[in-house]
Regions:
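Active-site metal-binding loops of divalent metal-dependent hydrolases
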Residues: 31, 167, 282
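Positively charged, low-complexity intrinsically disordered leader regions
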Residues: 1-42, 330
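Conserved post-catalytic alpha-helical subdomain immediately downstream of the catalytic base
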Residues: 243, 269-332
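Structural motif
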Residues: 26-28, 131, 160-163, 192, ...
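Conserved phosphate-binding/catalytic loop of the ribokinase/pfkB sugar-kinase fold
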Residues: 108-114, 121-156
């Protein structure tokens, strides 16, 4: 497996970043609200051996598949989203915030029986103290499935690629997954998947799948490390009938398994890692925008995605990377 982190010129990078602008991508999957409560710890509670966080700031951001949308928008793309939200305050918040940042929201379907997923993280001194989740994970009705099916059909018109962002909250199920596979094949559209372990038996016939190292290990049945990496890539390709695989490995960078070429390694480009929240969303967004272009290799797409990941993990919270930040990261490393 060769190391490949120098095979992209600045001129080529900037041409790819420019070409991302205006590209249309359909995002299907699980949306949520990422809430952050930030503060400082100055004492331990007298009631229990736990830190007392003095709250200084609160913020809420679109998360999950909605964070994929934020990443696409940050690069000048034109995303549409298809997902379920609850008929609640957080569902309305998601709809409003996505519309305000420029995402088409006609594909957001409201479910009266569902609580919109909310992940709340308490952060002090750049360390996560605790996270608590509020959500409902239930099968949805035939009526809602029909609404989602219609939203997918509308959303596929005129797009350049499709991202399935599966966070295991119930939206990605067999019938809708198969519909997307059938329609993307028929329309010759690029299909990328960010997988979730619980749904591994659903997945098949994907252009690109992007598991992290833990997810890759569960897909292939053995731990993924330097010695087993090559075998893991082959196994995942076979299991999901995927044309290509990119395994994200945190501080160890990425491993790229193209359709018929030698696997490649990319070292991480992060100077410091403050927060990995949403980094996988950044990776699949950039990979889809670039790998779906004519004449672009998976190696080139992965180099750009690796630069973008290096930008976002150096920020706190659910972050995105702009074209200018990716270009600056490249120049800093040159």
């Amino acid at each position: 497996m060769k190391n490949s982190d120098k095979n992209l010129s600045l001129a080529r990078l900037e041409s790819l970043l420019e070409a991302m602008r205006g590209r249309r991508v359909l995002v299907f999957g699980d949306v949520m609200v990422d809430c952050f409560i930030r503060g400082v710890v100055e004492r331990i509670s007298p009631e229990a051996p736990v830190p007392v966080v003095s709250v200084r700031k609160r913020e809420s951001l679109p998360g999950g598949a909605a964070n994929v949308v934020r990443n696409l928008l940050a690069l000048g793309a034109r995303p549409e989203i298809v997902a379920l939200v609850g008929e609640d305050r957080h569902g309305r918040l998601l709809q409003r915030e996505l519309a305000e940042i420029g995402c088409g929201t006609k594909g957001l379907v409201a479910d009266a029986e569902r609580e919109t997923s909310v992940k709340t993280r308490v952060v002090a001194h750049r360390q996560q103290v605790v996270r608590f989740d509020q959500e409902t994970i239930l099968p949805f009705s035939a009526s809602l499935r029909d609404q989602l099916r219609q939203a997918i059909s509308r959303g596929l018109e005129g797009v350049d690629g499709v991202i399935i962002s599966d966070y295991g909250k119930g939206v990605v199920e067999e019938e809708l997954f198969n519909l997307l596979v059938t329609e993307t094949r028929r329309r010759q559209l690029f299909l990328a998947l960010d997988p979730k372990v619980a749904n591994y038996d659903l997945y098949h016939d994907i252009d690109l799948v992007t598991p992290n190292a833990d997810e890759a290990g569960q897909a292939c049945g053995f731990p993924v490390n330097d010695e087993t990496l090559a075998a893991a890539g082959v196994k995942i390709k076979e299991r999901f009938r995927s044309q290509a695989v990119v395994i994200t490995r945190g501080e160890d960078g990425m491993a790229i398994f193209p359709q018929s070429r030698t696997p490649m390694l990319l070292p991480t480009q992060a100077r410091e890692v403050f927060d990995v929240t949403g980094a996988g969303d950044t990776v699949i967004s950039v990979l889809t925008l670039t790998a779906s272009m004519a004449g672009v290799t998976l190696e080139e797409a992965a180099i750009v995605a690796n630069l973008a990941a290096g930008v976002v993990v150096g920020k706190t919270g659910t972050a995105t990377a702009s074209a200018a930040e990716i270009s600056d990261c490249y120049k800093r490393l040159s």
